[in-house]
């Protein structure tokens, strides 16, 4: 930790203070108890439920490495493997179901800047806090995006947000027109990845097609499939039963908080003396006014991590922003 307190300017009537702090912590797990398994879980869980991410102590990594078993499954070339739902005409990433490291919760550094300006009896102070780095899991973004409640889920919803426009030509297996035939949509998108071996889909022509090893883009260009609806894409990518880790809810946490602004005034001694006091001052303060920078999508509160346990990394709901305002009268006798 480094702290630097400075007075860049001072004269008879003016004084300017400028202070900085910088904190960085590097750590590494050297050894675990012989009875421990591959790692010791701290917070969260893998393998069941709707969390599917866990902070852990693992030899060779930092305290608080993040592990998940719902990373997208990939082939040897790094391509995401897609599964298919015929009923929804939707493709979605398969889960790896292997515990894999997806990052760690430790910030790269913490810092603060505070400055104060005094002119005669009038004073002003402002303080900023900041954090850069370390991953958090924002479950409000995950499930909010799955059901279309977040601003980030607007992407592809219409032409104005990048959605593809097409008129459906889907036929039933007997060659008759399906219920969507002739309907024009504006919310199309093409998911990334290739279909798993053995994947069969009902195509636009109502017939079954083997799309093993084919990308969705190729299936679209070959006239087998139509674009996928944005609502289905977000739902499959984020819901509890099929969702995978993605940038929509696993984020690098960075913020600069406007922590405090205070304005104060110290009355002349002759005024304080009228009430029998030696000192009399008044100040107005506002704390937690907002964020000059916030890396989290959908304006999520970056300080919404629940609890004070050292292994906690989850923001589990949309916590409101709170600020407080105070007026203080200082009297000295």
Model-predicted regions and their roles:
Residues 1-333:
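Outer/extracellular conduits and scaffolds centered on Gram-negative outer-membrane beta-barrels
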């Amino acid at each position: 930790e480094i702290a630097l307190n400075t007075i860049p300017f001072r004269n008879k009537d003016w004084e300017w203070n400028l202070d900085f702090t910088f904190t960085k912590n590097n750590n590494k797990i050297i050894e675990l108890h012989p009875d421990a398994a591959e790692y010791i879980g701290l917070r969260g869980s893998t393998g069941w439920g709707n969390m599917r991410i866990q902070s852990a102590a693992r030899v060779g990594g930092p305290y608080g490495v993040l592990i998940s078993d719902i990373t997208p499954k990939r082939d040897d070339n790094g391509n995401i493997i897609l599964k298919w739902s015929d009923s929804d005409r939707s493709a979605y990433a398969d889960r790896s179901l292997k515990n894999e490291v997806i990052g760690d919760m430790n910030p790269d550094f913490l810092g603060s800047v505070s400055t104060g300006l005094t002119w005669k009896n009038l004073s002003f102070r402002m303080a900023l806090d900041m954090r850069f780095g370390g991953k958090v899991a924002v479950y409000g973004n995950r499930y909010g995006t799955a059901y279309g409640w977040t601003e980030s889920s607007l992407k592809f919803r219409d032409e104005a947000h990048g959605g593809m426009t097409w008129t459906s030509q889907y036929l039933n297996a007997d060659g008759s027109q399906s219920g969507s035939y002739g309907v024009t949509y504006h919310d199309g998108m093409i998911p990334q990845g290739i279909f798993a071996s053995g994947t069969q889909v009902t195509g636009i022509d109502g017939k079954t097609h083997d799309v093993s090893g084919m990308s969705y883009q190729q299936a679209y260009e070959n006239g087998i499939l139509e674009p996928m609806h944005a609502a289905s894409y977000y739902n499959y990518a984020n819901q509890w039963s099929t969702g995978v880790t993605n940038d929509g809810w696993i984020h690098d946490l960075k913020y600069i908080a406007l922590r405090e602004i205070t304005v104060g005034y110290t009355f002349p001694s002759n005024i304080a003396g009228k009430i029998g006091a030696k000192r009399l001052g008044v100040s107005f303060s506002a704390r937690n006014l907002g964020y000059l920078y916030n890396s989290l999508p959908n304006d999520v509160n970056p300080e919404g991590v629940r609890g004070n346990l050292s292994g906690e990394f989850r923001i589990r709901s949309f916590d409101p922003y709170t600020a407080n305002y105070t007026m203080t009268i200082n009297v000295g006798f």
